[in-house]
């Protein structure tokens, strides 16, 4: 589900670049040095279960992105999203309510991955890795805790698995 787009600094792919520690934020960069990238959520339907990976942009981001993201994240991401792009509206068009989501899996808590989280808090389970939840407690310019405050996120314990793509896996069901 494409929930809109964002402008990303070309430094995102190389945060250790000579451009400085925070060059990836895109602040004070011209649009010429930024890339227009899609913001997506992935719906997986398997064995009668509805699983959503990430949430993309929300309805609130379409209505008032500066307020929703805060000034720094707004300027660093410059979201483009309409109400119909939001994950909640797209799921609704497919006949899926938040309560019909068996799981929402958050890969990480950057704003473009969790903006739509509050629209989906009726999901049966919302997961993120234990490590990501621990990192979210630290100061991080890429995170806006208001996007997940009041939403219960369950920690996933990742286990060593030599067959898994990154050497770890977890069984949710």
Q: Model-predicted segments: where are they?
A:
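Glycine/Thr-rich phosphate-binding loops of Rossmann-like dinucleotide-binding domains
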Residues: 61, 114-115, 136
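Divalent metal-coordination and catalytic microenvironments
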Residues: 44, 53-54, 101, 108, ...
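Active-site metal-binding motif and surrounding structural segment of the metallo-beta-lactamase
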Residues: 66-128
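Extracellular structured ligand-interaction cores
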Residues: 39-41, 48-50, 104-106, 123, ...
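Metallo-beta-lactamase
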Residues: 1-96, 100, 129-173
């Amino acid at each position: 589900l494409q929930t809109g787009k964002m402008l990303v600094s070309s430094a995102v792919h190389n945060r250790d670049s000579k451009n400085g520690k925070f060059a990836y934020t895109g602040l004070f960069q011209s649009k010429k040095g930024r890339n227009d990238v899609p913001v997506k959520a992935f719906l997986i339907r398997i064995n009668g279960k509805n699983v959503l990976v990430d949430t993309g942009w929300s309805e609130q981001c379409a209505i008032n992105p500066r307020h929703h993201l805060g000034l720094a994240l707004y300027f660093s991401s410059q979201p483009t999203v309409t109400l119909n792009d939001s994950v909640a509206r797209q799921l609704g068009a497919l006949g899926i309510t938040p309560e019909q989501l068996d799981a929402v899996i958050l890969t990480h808590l950057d704003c473009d991955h969790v903006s739509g989280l509050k629209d989906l808090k009726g999901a049966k389970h919302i997961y993120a890795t234990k490590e990501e939840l621990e990192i979210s407690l630290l100061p991080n310019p890429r995170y806006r805790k208001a996007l997940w405050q009041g939403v219960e996120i369950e920690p996933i314990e990742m286990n060593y698995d030599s067959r898994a793509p990154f050497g770890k896996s977890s069984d949710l069901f």
